[in-house]
C-alpha cells in the first residue's frame, strides 16, 4: 500500500525489525540505546538481550474519567533479576496486571512468558507478544494523527480476559524532547523514558476472576528502560500523568542517591504542546498532608497528595494538585495511586480531572 502521508514527511515507507527474546538472562554485556533513533521510540532498547542489571519495559495504564475508583495498569517486562527489584521468576519476561475496582478493592496478578517474547517494530507501529502469558499489545504508526494501542489479555489460568484500548490525545515525545532522532531519553542517570502516548482516551473492558472492570478514562503508554539497578540509581521519585480540562500533563521529579534532583515535564492543551522541559525545576513535585517528608524514605506510607508547579518561563507557571483516593500498589519501596486532579495556569481558570501517579522510595 502506498503511504503518501509518510513520504510527505520525508519518512521511509516501511522498515521493520523483529526481535525474539528467550526466557533467560543474557550473560554478557547488553548494548542499550541512550539516544533516540528514527522510528524507534517504542522499540526494544536492550540488545541482544537484557543481562542481570538491565531492564526494558512497556507500560500501559488507565484511570476512570468518573468519580469512581476503577483503574488498571499492565506492564510488559524484560528485566534482569538485579534491575528493578522484582522477585526472580526464573527468567526476565513477565507481565504484571494491577488495578482497582469501583469499590476500591485492588488486585495485582501476573504471568511469566516461558516461551519467550516476540516484538516487531518499525515505521508501521509495534506488536509485542509475551508468549505463554496470553498477553500481547499492538500500536500504530506514531507519526500519524491519534495513534492507537491495544493491550489484549486471554489467560484462563489467571482468570483475566479483555482489552485496553488507548487513542492518543497528546503527541509522542522523549523525556528530553520531541519524537525525532538524536534526543536524550534520560529521566535520571541510568534510567530512560519514551512517552508514546503521554495522554490517551482509554476504553477498558476486562473480566478479572469473574469480576467486571469496564470504564472509559484517562490513559497513558510509555516505555522505560535502564542500564543499572534501579535502587542504585534512584533515592526517590514522583511520576505521574493526568488530565484537567483541555490540559494533559506528565511529570517526573526524581532524586539520586547522591541527592541531585532531576526533572521532566510536559503540558499539552487540546493536543498541542504548551511546555516540554527537563531543565532544573521545570516541574517541582512535593507531597502534602500526612507523610509529607521529602524525599520519602523506605517504608513510609503514601502521602495525602502532591502539589505540582510547572515553570513556564517569563514569570508564568502552571499549578496542579493531586489528591490520593486509593492506592493501586503499596510496598515498602513503591506506591502507585489514583485520585482527583485539579489545575490550571496560575491566576487563571482552574479545572478538575483525574490522574494516576507513583512514588519510589529507597
Swiss-Prot record:
EC annotation from Swiss-Prot or TrEMBL: 4.2.1.-
Molecular function via GO: lyase activity; metal ion binding
Result, substituting residue 220 to A: Completely abolishes the activity
Record note on disruption phenotype: Abolishes the production of penigequinolone and accumulates the epoxide formed by penE.
Cited SUPFAM superfamilies: AttH-like
Transmembrane residue ranges: none
Reactions catalysed: [(1'E)-5'-(3',3'-dimethyloxiran-2'-yl)-3'-hydroxy-3'-methylpent-1'-en-1'-yl]-quinolinone B = yaequinolone D
Active-site feature positions: 220, 222 (broensted acid)
Enzyme class label: lyase
Protein origin, superkingdom: Eukaryota
Keywords attached to this entry: Copper, Lyase, Metal-binding
Pathway membership, UniProt: Secondary metabolite biosynthesis; Alkaloid biosynthesis; Mycotoxin biosynthesis
Stored Pfam families: DA_N
The protein's role, per its UniProt record: Quinolone epoxide rearrangement protein; part of the gene cluster that mediates the biosynthesis of penigequinolones, potent insecticidal alkaloids that contain a highly modified 10-carbon prenyl group. The first stage is catalyzed by the nonribosomal peptide synthetase penN that condenses anthranilic acid and O-methyl-L-tyrosine to produce 4'-methoxycyclopeptin. 4'-methoxycyclopeptin is then converted to 4'-methoxydehydrocyclopeptin by the ketoglutarate-dependent dioxygenase penM through dehydrogenation to form a double bond between C-alpha and C-beta of the O-methyltyrosine side chain.
Family of this protein: Belongs to the quinolone epoxide rearrangement protein penF family.
Protein name from the UniProt record: Quinolone epoxide rearrangement protein penF
Protein's organism: Penicillium thymicola
Gene for this chain: penF
Amino acid at each position: 500500500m502506498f503511504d503518501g502521508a509518510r513520504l510527505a514527511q520525508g519518512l521511509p515507507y516501511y522498515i521493520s525489525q523483529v526481535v525474539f527474546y528467550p526466557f533467560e538472562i543474557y550473560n554478557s554485556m547488553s548494548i542499550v540505546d541512550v539516544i533516540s533513533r528514527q522510528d524507534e521510540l517504542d522499540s526494544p532498547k536492550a540488545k541482544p538481550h537484557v543481562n542481570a542489571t538491565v531492564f526494558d519495559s512497556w507500560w500501559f495504564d488507565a484511570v476512570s474519567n468518573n468519580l469512581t475508583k476503577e483503574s488498571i495498569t499492565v506492564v510488559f517486562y524484560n528485566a534482569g533479576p538485579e534491575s528493578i527489584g522484582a522477585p526472580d521468576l526464573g527468567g526476565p519476561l513477565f507481565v504484571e496486571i494491577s488495578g482497582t475496582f469501583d469499590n476500591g478493592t485492588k488486585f495485582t496478578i501476573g504471568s511469566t512468558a516461558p516461551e519467550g517474547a516476540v516484538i516487531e517494530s518499525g515505521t508501521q507501529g509495534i506488536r509485542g507478544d509475551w508468549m505463554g502469558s496470553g498477553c500481547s499489545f499492538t500500536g500504530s504508526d506514531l507519526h500519524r494523527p491519534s495513534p492507537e494501542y491495544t493491550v489484549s489479555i486471554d489467560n484462563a489460568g489467571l482468570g483475566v480476559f479483555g482489552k485496553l484500548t488507548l487513542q492518543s490525545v497528546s503527541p509522542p515525545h522523549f523525556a528530553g524532547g520531541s519524537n525525532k532522532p538524536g534526543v536524550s531519553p534520560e529521566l535520571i542517570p541510568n534510567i530512560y523514558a519514551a512517552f508514546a502516548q503521554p495522554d490517551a482516551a482509554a476504553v477498558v473492558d476486562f473480566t478479572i476472576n469473574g469480576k467486571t472492570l469496564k470504564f472509559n478514562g484517562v490513559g497513558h503508554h510509555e516505555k522505560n528502560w535502564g542500564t543499572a539497578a534501579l535502587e542504585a540509581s534512584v533515592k526517590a521519585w514522583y511520576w505521574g500523568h493526568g488530565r484537567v480540562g483541555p490540559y494533559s500533563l506528565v511529570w517526573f521529579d526524581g532524586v539520586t542517591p547522591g541527592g541531585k534532583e532531576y526533572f521532566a515535564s510536559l503540558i499539552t492543551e487540546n493536543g498541542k504542546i504548551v511546555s516540554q522541559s527537563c531543565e532544573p525545576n521545570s516541574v517541582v513535585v512535593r507531597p502534602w498532608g500526612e507523610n509529607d517528608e521529602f524525599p520519602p524514605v523506605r517504608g513510609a506510607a503514601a502521602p495525602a497528595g502532591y502539589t505540582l508547579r510547572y515553570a513556564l518561563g517569563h514569570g508564568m507557571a502552571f499549578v496542579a494538585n493531586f489528591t490520593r483516593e486509593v492506592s493501586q500498589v503499596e510496598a515498602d519501596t513503591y506506591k502507585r495511586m489514583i485520585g482527583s486532579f485539579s489545575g490550571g495556569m496560575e491566576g487563571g481558570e482552574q479545572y478538575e480531572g483525574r490522574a494516576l501517579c507513583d512514588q519510589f522510595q529507597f
